[in-house]
Amino acid sequence: MSYEQMTRSDLIRLLEQHDQARSEAGKDGIVMSYTGRTAPWQIIRQVKPKMTKINQRVSTGAVHEQAENIVMEGENLSAMVTLYKYRGQVDLVLTDPPYNTGEDFRYNDKWDQDPNDPDLGDLVPKEDGSRHSKWLRFMTPRLWMMREMLKPGGVIAICIDHRELYRLGMLMDEIFREENRIGIINWQKAYSPKSDTGGKKGGLSTATEYVLVYAKDIDKAKTTLLDRTEEMDARYQSTVDGDPDEWKSGDCSGPNASTHRKMVYAIQSPFTGKLFYPPEGRCWANEKPTMKAWLEGWGSEYQDKWIDDDNQYTDKNGKLWKVKALVLKGTTFVNGEQVAGQKIIKDARTLALKKMKEGTWPPLFFGLTGETGPQQKRYLKDVKKGKVAMTYWANEDYTIPLNIESQSWDHEESGHSQTGINELNAVVGKGHDFKTVKPLRLMSKIIQIWCKPDGIVLDPFAGSGTTGHAVLDVNHKAGANRRFILIEQGNDVKGDLYAKTLTADRIRRVITGDWKAGKCSPLGGGFQFQELKRQQVDAAAVSALQREEMIDLLLTSHWDKSERSKTSLSRLLPGDSRYLFAVNSRNEGFFLIWDGADKPSILNRETFKNIIQEAKIHSLAERYHVYAALAPYSGRTVEFYKIPDRVLEHIGFNSRADAYNNDVDVDVEVEQG
């Protein structure tokens, strides 16, 4: 950009845009500044949806299963804009973008002015001095669009390593806001030192990578507990006392003694007569009546008693409180010390030892012999049905060899990235040219935590398809119904846009169980393979489509306001009917009166009679969804969609501004359908 050649008005406009971008991005906070920075919303507003084609040969599964998931081949920014029906509908964005390691992403400088330019640009080499600013310019509009795809309570989990960690973190703080940062996961990708020190003498071998996790709105986001492991549950047992419920010993004190002074007092052991107080700074975790009942479970009567142990405090009103101890009824104390040789203590010990031998001890006990301080039974049935995820995920989550029916292998190389490679090799075979693949367990764990069982997972940098594989695997194990959208451009250096030959192939193989390493249990499901075309969608382009092209567009763009992203049309085989081309989940038929731009497209009485007949043949509900250019006939059971108007509306076309995605609210009021 040459400022000398710009007019005064152009310079003023540029400064205004710059000030607006700084104001919106920073909101009085830190604002990133780099060469070629453009406000992401200014770029997004220029991106136009593209035509899509369904490749039935690559699609997998039954017709209704194909409608559940999407693998899309194409540039991801255009793809996300094209997937308008999913705007604001995604539960989790889980993705692994280019790490800027050198020649791992392409950038076209023309995208700054025209993001619709079809040229993908050149690979950015490691030696490029502007590689960081190019990476930021590449990522910024895509992250903005990922945020737009999320539900209000949606979450994004984005993988990165040390090369762009700091820049990505600042960018995420700008776009998602710092207050919406859930955490930064530090996962151990290797457990043995390697020669990789980042190209620097005296450097450190990189053993960890990171996942930055942000919510669209942290007040609406939900972090789910992970499933408990067998190892965790094995700590609970009932063989000690024969208790029918499994338990383990735990602390009977809690924090915040300063605000719970009445719960700081002595309790007397029924075995030894010794007095026990909570640890410094802590208080008993249970109410005093509960503690008294548990102590009396050992056979002796207890009482509240001031034992002159100086356990007192003054409240905020200046009132002095003497906190009484829980002691065996009838015992005598002098200055907080019990008088020795009391018969009450000997009798209490006899009763307590008898109870210990009989089994099923009270919840408060004094060790396995009665000689230690107080402990509390923690019952498995009372524990949360899961565990809270931490920000450090160590190697034990990823080192377990992947089982393939009767076959399994151990790691030939140290490092958890190799686990991902092994998993990919097992499914599709070697020779895929992928050197780094995320482990299946890593992605599965993230999905479990931040995507509900019937939610949608989006991966705009799908790569080898690990995210889709993980969704299917988690669904299969838990009986869930999560859906995925995978977007992959591929790399055409070798003439192979691997969205078909690798991404879709991996998903197909795990669905069917047809792994390269041998037959495995099929995970089930299906997906629709969509190809993003270069042709932009507008009224003229829609009106010029042939029938099969129009059907592809309708199948990929149609949504019902009452269901939005859950709207899925199952396509019927071509040639089955003259007008009927799909059905929805309510068994309602979708009919297309269209044979090309030069043929009549009219819903009249005669055509409607034929539509009713086709619906009866397929035993469909009496609700008819009809796409046509004109509709002189109408009826209470007819839902009419005008071509091209309603088609454009379903992909986010704003007719008032004659532009796409021009601040269109996804909940804009439209006619039902």
Short names for language-model regions:
Residues 473, 477-673:
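PRPP-dependent phosphoribosyltransferase catalytic core
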Residues 72-74, 158-160, 395, 460, ...:
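Short His-Asn-centered micro-motif
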Residues 86-87, 107-110, 171-173, 471, ...:
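Short, glycine/charged-enriched secondary-structure capping and boundary segments
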Residues 3-456, 672-673:
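Class I S-adenosyl-L-methionine
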